From Swiss-Prot:
Keyword presence, Transcription: yes
Covalent S-S links between cysteines: none
Gene3D superfamilies found in the cross-reference section: Zn(2)-C6 fungal-type DNA-binding domain (4.10.240.10)
Protein name: Cutinase transcription factor 1 beta
Lineage of source species: Eukaryota, Fungi, Dikarya, Ascomycota, Pezizomycotina
Compartment(s): Nucleus
GO biological process: DNA-templated transcription
Organism: Fusarium vanettenii (Neocosmospora pisi)
InterPro entries: Fungal_Detox/Toxin_TFs, Transcription_factor_dom_fun, Zn2-C6_fun-type_DNA-bd_sf, Zn2Cys6_DnaBD
Record keyword ATP-binding present: no
Swiss-Prot/TrEMBL keywords: DNA-binding, Metal-binding, Nucleus, Transcription, Transcription regulation, Zinc
DNA-binding region boundaries: 53-81
Cross-referenced SUPFAM superfamilies: Zn2/Cys6 DNA-binding domain (SSF57701)
Annotated GO CC locations: nucleus
Length: 882
């Protein structure tokens, strides 16, 4: 549509038609024919309207603001109608009055400031929930509930106003929808501008808050660097409309900064934190300025951990909506080349790697990691800064940034099975040392971080976290060696002439598993790492004292460090179970294979125990996306062992699966990757014909019901998880009768190695996980030794209420999956019989088998190994220690 109106005619049928009869003579003269003839021609030609408000101009739709303010479109959209100052005539175009009403002083001043703030509101207050604001920058939810009154149902607001975080004011809508008790008649239908109107007070509020900004170059707070002049004016307006130039309210900013300090900076120390906080604290630019791009990236990374009440106060309905909003702001600033400092670009891009939305997103975690590494190489971050003349403080910062790149690169390779971006031989930056970290107390006059944050004021805690970060960097070196020893780059999808661009480069186990010496060397390296850990990094069972006095961040980082360690062990030993093909002779001894099975199973149990402890202490919500990376493989191992013929083994596996699922449920509230993992596991359980409710015996259920209230395992349902309906949920199905499956005659696929996880009929070696009465970790409560689970309140139906899981979207999810998690390239539905063939491994040219066949084949393959020892234990094996 063109922003034009028929000359001399009323506006088209719309809300504006109610005010068409009040056009003044002066306005009619302005709209007369250019010839000056007072008589209107029979056929008129369209021409541009004399004026159009900012909203209609941006949308390129017809505006009738000359007939009365607000225009009809703005009234329908419930937004403020603002007319910008003319750029041609350099004079103010005031909001038109109706029925000859004189223009108010407020309108004159509003038009004066409208050019610098088209939305009519303070940039700092753009995200503040207000009854007059219909703008929010997050966009994950649909606009279906934008206006529910029947009088407005037929009008679809513009996408500018259809944002997920939008929360309309019910009081305002009641006023808009009521007139003398008639809900179908809006208040503007009669005498809009001659009676006190809701819009008057809203415009007054917006007008007052907009006075503080004089021009488009002064919209950012003083502590943020202004926009570069190379960004065009229309691009600046676009960034304003999208909210990229806005910052949240001060309470939300401060809460996000505290969350960043406590739960992001410890494992990614890529900034001089005290200097950064000092700049923000003054807010006047006297201590310097920081990058808006980096600031938005910091708030995005912190939005995963900040208390939800601050996000709700900021106008966000869900944590996912808040994370998406902050990420979109950050990405827009990157796309429009706001930042030119390459070091700052590397810092912010590293934080952007924590975004993951859909599996088919081309610019996913791996993409942003690649951009960050490329920029890091261009400025020489991969070289030893000690050989340069830069200041010592800068050398330390560069070392921390480089090792942050290295650690993130290795964890992405471990979690996504993507090739590493950094090669071990391509850098010479020495290992981090404690002196490389910024360990100092925050200035007393800094009020950005509240006094309740102990970390920035406790040197011992900072020192512990620095040592943990060093240990994590050393572990990532071991991860690099593990990937090199056991995995290679393969094309995940079979290349097809008509579909050659959808293949994904992935890491998969080496075809020839004759590298026993290499695996043993890496295994010894990992054990040496664990034995040499400093005292503060050594694993210990979490207690309530670990979450007091602000020490929860140390508990989370220490536990996550060991979860990554056991995930690395699992990834190292999984390919050792079977030869590359069952037709070939084993390339490793049976004892080596058996030991690898036990190592993988023991790693899964350690991960499960740690996840349970985090859940009991309510710390699982502070896990980064790496939490999905470390928990999913443990759950799949439990899933495979649920087909074990031994009841005790099935109960143990089901118990561990449920414990991990509770943590995964919590992660679903934050990360989309956890959504896909949950749907994947539910489909896998269905295809494997596993009834999780029937797998737990009455004795276990009785023991699991002894739960103190303070550590109930009840998990609230996720806020946005539409995957499967209640009727379709696996856990709502009735238990099926057990049907013995014949041993399959077809041979297993080449990559079914992980299907042969330890599924023996005997119990595994005792670990601390099984020393408690129900096989769980002892209570973290000092006053009780009861098992900390509540079956009555337990969220076992983890897919209840969700829509059908979309397998067509699963094409490379951000999970820790390897050879048996090869998602089908074309996507499959829950009705496909060969689903688990892709789960357990699919050969390129070999036939597949059903889920039950694959799992039963794995059990039969282990029968002789189990029979060799009466207790099911490999000769010479020592029970695993905690």
């Amino acid at each position: 549509m063109n922003a034009e109106t028929p000359e001399g005619s009323a506006a088209p049928p719309s809300p504006a038609s109610t005010s068409a009869k009040t056009v003044t003579d002066k306005t009619n003269k302005k709209r007369a024919s250019p010839s000056g003839d007072s008589e209107q021609p029979t056929k008129v030609t369209k021409r541009r309207a004399a004026r159009a408000c900012v909203s209609c101009r941006a949308r390129k739709v017809r505006c009738d603001v000359v007939e009365g303010a607000p225009c009809g479109n703005c009234r329908w959209d419930n937004v403020e109608c603002v007319v910008q100052e003319s750029r041609r005539r350099k004079k103010n175009l005031l909001t038109a009055s109706t029925a000859g009403q004189p223009v108010s002083t407020e309108a004159q001043l509003r038009c004066k400031t409208a050019a610098s703030n088209p939305m009519g509101m303070s940039t700092a207050d753009l995200r503040r929930p207000s009854s007059g604001s219909a703008i929010s920058t997050s966009s994950i939810d649909g606009p279906s509930s934008f206006l529910s009154n029947s009088g407005l149902d037929n009008h679809v607001p513009h996408m500018i106003y259809q944002r997920s975080g939008y929360r309309h004011d019910p009081v305002l809508l009641n006023k808009l929808h009521s007139n003398d008790g008639n809900p179908q008649r809006p208040v503007w239908s009669n005498n809009l501008m001659t009676t006190p109107s809701v819009f008057d007070s809203l415009r007054t509020f917006r007008f007052i808050s907009s006075l503080e900004e004089q021009d488009s170059t002064a919209q950012l707070p003083a502590f943020l660097r202004p926009l570069p002049t190379k960004i065009a004016a229309e691009d600046v307006k676009y960034l304003q409309i999208k909210g990229a130039l806005s910052v949240p309210t001060l309470p939300l900013q401060n809460a996000l900064l505290q969350a960043y300090v406590e739960y992001v900076h410890p494992y990614m120390p890529l900034m001089d934190l005290n200097s950064f906080l000092g700049i923000i604290n003054t807010r006047d630019g006297q201590n310097g300025q920081t990058s808006l791009f980096l600031y938005q990236a910091v708030m995005f990374a912190a939005s995963a951990f900040v208390d939800m009440k601050y996000l709700r106060e900021g106008g966000y309905t869900t944590r996912k909506a808040a994370r998406k909003s902050f990420f979109q702001k950050t990405r827009l600033l990157y796309d429009f080349d706001y930042e030119s400092d390459r070091l700052v670009l590397v810092q912010a891009l590293l934080l952007m790697t924590y975004w993951y939305e859909t599996p088919d997103d081309q610019k996913d975690t791996w993409h942003w990691m690649g951009v960050a590494i490329s920029l890091a190489h261009t400025i020489g971050l991969h070289r030893n800064p000690g050989s340069t003349s830069m200041a010592p403080a800068k050398q330390k910062l560069w070392k921390r940034i480089w090792w942050s790149c290295f650690m993130r690169d290795r964890l992405i390779a471990l979690g996504m099975r993507r090739p590493t971006r950094i090669k071990d031989e391509d850098f010479d930056v020495p290992m981090l040392e404690e002196s490389d970290f910024e360990i100092e107390v925050l200035a007393d006059d800094n009020t950005v971080i509240p006094a309740s944050c102990t970390l920035v004021r406790n040197l011992d805690m900072q020192r512990e976290l620095a040592i943990m970060c060093i240990s994590k960097a050393q572990l990532c070196v071991c991860i690099s060696h593990m990937l090199k020893a056991q995995y290679s780059v393969l094309i995940r999808d079979k290349m097809k002439p008509e579909n050659t661009t959808n293949s994904t480069m992935m890491l998969f186990p080496n075809k020839q598993l004759d590298n026993v010496e290499g695996v043993t060397e890496v295994d010894h390296e990992l054990m040496a790492w664990a034995e040499s850990l400093p005292t503060c990094c050594q694993y210990r069972t979490l207690t309530p004292l670990d979450v007091k006095d602000g020490r929860s961040t140390i508990a989370v980082q220490r536990t996550l460090l060991h979860m990554v360690y056991y995930t690395t062990i699992s990834a190292l030993h999984r390919p050792q179970f079977l030869p590359s093909s069952p037709l070939q002779a084993p390339t490793t001894s049976r004892q080596v294979q058996d030991m690898s099975r036990l190592r993988v199973r023991d790693a899964a149990m350690h991960i499960t125990r740690m996840a349970t402890e985090l859940h009991q202490c309510r710390l699982e919500r502070f896990l980064p996306t790496t939490g999905v990376t470390v928990i999913l493989p443990a759950m799949i191992i439990h899933l495979l062992e649920m087909k074990n013929p031994a009841p005790q083994a099935r109960e143990r596996a089901t118990r561990g699966f449920r414990q991990c699922m509770r943590v995964m449920e919590k992660l679903r509230e934050v990360y989309a990757a956890a959504d896909y993992a949950t749907g994947f596991l539910d489909a896998a359980l269905r295809k494997a014909a596993i009834d999780i409710n029937a797998s737990v015996g009455p004795s276990t259920l009785a023991m699991m019901k002894r739960v103190p209230v303070e550590f109930s395992a009840q998990t609230p349902p996720p806020e946005n998880a539409p995957y499967m309906t209640a009727a379709e949920s696996l856990f709502n199905e009735r238990p099926k009768e057990h049907r013995p499956q014949p041993t399959p005659t077809m041979m297993p696929p080449n990559t079914v190695n992980a299907a042969a996880l330890e599924l023996s009929t005997n119990s595994p070696p005792q670990t601390e996980l099984e020393e408690s009465p129900a096989g769980l970790t002892p209570s973290v409560s000092a006053a009780s030794e009861e098992i900390q689970l509540d079956v009555g309140n337990m969220d076992l139906d983890f897919m209840q209420g969700h829509d059908e899981f979309d397998w067509n979207a699963v094409a490379g999810t951000d999970f820790d999956v390897d050879q048996w998690l090869q998602f089908p390239p074309e996507g499959v539905t829950n009705q496909d019989d060969n689903l688990i063939a892709g789960v357990l491994g699919r050969g390129v040219e070999e036939p597949t088998m059903s889920a039950e066949q694959a799992l039963n084949w794995a059990i039969n393959a282990e029968a002789d190994a189990t029979a060799r020892q009466p207790d099911g234990r490999v000769q010479g094996e020592v029970p695993a220690q905690a």
